[in-house]
A protein has these predicted regions:
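Contiguous mixed-secondary-structure segments that line small-molecule binding/active-site clefts
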Residues: 102-195, 246-349
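Sec-dependent signal peptide recognition
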Residues: 24-29
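Glycine- and acidic-residue-rich phosphate-binding/metal-coordinating active-site segment common to enzymes
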Residues: 199, 203-238, 243-244, 249-250
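Short, glycine-/small- and polar/acidic-enriched structural segments
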Residues: 43-160, 234, 239-248
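Alpha-to-beta junction loops
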Residues: 91-101, 179, 199, 214-223
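Bilobed "Venus flytrap"/periplasmic-binding protein-like clamshell domains
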Residues: 42-72, 150-214
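Short, small-residue-biased leader/transition segments that mark boundaries at the very start
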Residues: 1-2
Length: 350
């Protein structure tokens, strides 16, 4: 393991001599507290965004967590929504104490894990795996907990790449004038699109593919997972291609309301993500490998580096403004340099 988790000392010192009556009262209070925790945890609900519904991979992973949680006397059920906003609304309205939703739309609950969706921050599944392995490190753990919400993990989905219906674009300069789908609540995406002379068009996760099919946008950033139900040539056009260059990383963040759960429950769930980090990212890699090779288009190292520099410039503006978590950005730089020392922000590349 990269780090060893630190467990706070919560031992309570009791007097050596204690009356038998006090012991009985203590035991009774302890018993009542345990039984009350068990019963109240049994009513918990996790609202989950899964485009594939109850049979989707995201729901399956959440049910794995549900079974894992039972060994800690915590029971919850998973309610899946195919429209993300419905899951978020149910969570905000108090209908559920857990939420599984995209890292793009969980920013409001946790700044650190919300930054996992940042442009140019997580370049591949290996870096995502390394992040998961660090979730219970004390320096990171304290950034995952605030008064009302706690981030307990992320299900990796994969990198978001540009999907387009033409084979005429292979350079950044050729993006000028193109209509590119962006999320309305994501200013860095909008700034990035404008920086290349393209036109940002607002979409959300539920209508982006429909907008692309109806030619309301020319370029759709998307993870391969979202494309798997489609035949790209038949459903989008004969010249459809996917640029093998990640714009951002797509993951499903798990957010809970910690007051609804026993102490240290969040840490136990993060431990599950640490233990299963390789399995989770392998699944994301399998999805990406499932897309036939002839759809992928590589760009030159020079083009990648030019684009990386442009992305970093915009990203750093949003670090200074406080939109992205500064510690998270520095952590991602270090993890990225371990994986790709040639990246221009790494010491070895200078």
């Amino acid at each position: 393991p990269l780090f060893r988790s630190e467990i706070p000392d919560e031992a309570v010192k009791l007097p050596i001599k204690i009356k038998r009556l006090k012991v009985k009262k203590f035991c009774l209070a302890f018993f009542l507290s345990v039984t009350s925790v068990t019963s109240w945890a049994g009513d918990q609900v996790w609202c989950a965004y899964d485009p594939a519904g109850t049979q989707g991979d995201i729901t399956r992973r959440l049910n794995d967590i549900r079974l894992y949680a039972q060994q800690y006397q915590v029971k919850f059920k998973v309610v899946s929504y195919q429209k993300e906003q419905q899951a978020i609304q149910a969570f905000d309205e108090g209908k559920c104490s857990g939420l599984a939703a995209s890292n793009f739309n969980t920013y409001q609950y946790n700044h650190f894990m919300g930054s996992t969706s940042g442009i140019g921050l997580i370049p591949n599944n290996r870096t995502a795996r390394n992040l998961l392995q660090l979730l219970n490190h004390p320096t990171i753990e304290k950034r995952l907990i605030n008064k009302d919400y706690e981030a307990v993990g992320m299900i990796p989905v994969g990198t978001a790449n540009m999907v387009m219906k033409t084979k005429k674009i292979s350079k950044v300069a050729q993006l000028r004038g193109q209509r590119i789908g962006v999320l309305a609540n994501n200013p860095p995406q909008q700034a990035l699109v404008r920086s290349v002379g393209a036109q940002p068009v607002y979409v959300d996760l539920s209508n982006a593919i429909a907008q692309f099919q109806q030619n309301k946008i020319d370029i759709m950033p998307a993870p391969v997972y979202g494309l798997l139900p489609y035949n790209l040539q038949k459903d989008f056009g004969p010249d459809t291609q996917v640029i093998n260059f990640p714009l951002a990383y797509f993951g499903v963040n798990i957010i809970i309301k910690p007051q609804a759960y026993p102490a240290n429950f969040g840490r136990k769930i993060r431990a599950w993500f640490v233990q299963n980090s390789q399995l989770l990212t392998n699944r994301a890699i399998q999805w990406e490998n499932h897309l036939p090779a002839y759809y992928w288009v590589d760009v030159s190292f020079y083009e990648k580096q030019s684009y990386d520099i442009m992305v970093a410039k915009i990203r750093n503006q949003y670090v200074r403004s406080g939109y992205y978590d500064a510690y998270f950005v520095e952590l991602m730089k270090r993890l990225r340099c371990i994986d790709d020392p040639r990246y221009f922000e790494c010491p070895m590349s200078r």
